[in-house]
Amino acid sequence: MKKLYSIVGMWIVSAFCLLSAQSRVYSSVENVHSHNDYLQNVPFYTAYSARCASIEADVFLVDGELYVAHKENEINKARKLRNLYLNPIREQFEMNGGSGYPNGKSFQLLIDLKTDYKETMKVLEQQLLEYRDCFDVKKNPLAVRVVVSGFLPSPEEFSNYADFIFFDGRPRFIYTPEQSLRIPMMSTSFRTLTQWNGLGRMVETDYNMVKAFID
């Protein structure tokens, strides 16, 4: 079943939908997406305690390390992807006996690359491989699914990366059946579909465009 994520703490600027080919068991809390989660007073744990279905971290590669920040000039060397997300996820995963959330539910970690993918993906893949048990949904459907967004490799390059790493799709591409297996969600600018500002009702033509994209 396709679902549209709600975006927490900001205007909706992107439309996210889950493809039916990649059905998962998610939290029952309205499938909320924690956008720019690292800006929370307590990153990861605030969204985790609310049982968000998707948690987002923007990532920069600097001197061979991955840092979580909104802008490059906001990078804090203490705020590494490993510290803020990978280690806490592993801790909770092990406490839950091999599940993202207790009671047989899970979530996705959306990693938005803010630096060129060629070098950033190398380091990201190396780090994720250290936590493979937590993220390999092919071996364990209750593991945490990793989806990479932002500066993405081309669809032809998807197969160069570990098969438990997924990618955020773009409607401008026509994916092969094999590439589509790596695409659990699609994103586009909300403004490409409608100019609705959130006030009043969306006009019917815009509503139909948004609905068609989700469907």
Regions found by a protein language model. Name each.
Residues 21-215:
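Phosphate-group recognition and catalysis centered on beta-loop-alpha active-site segments
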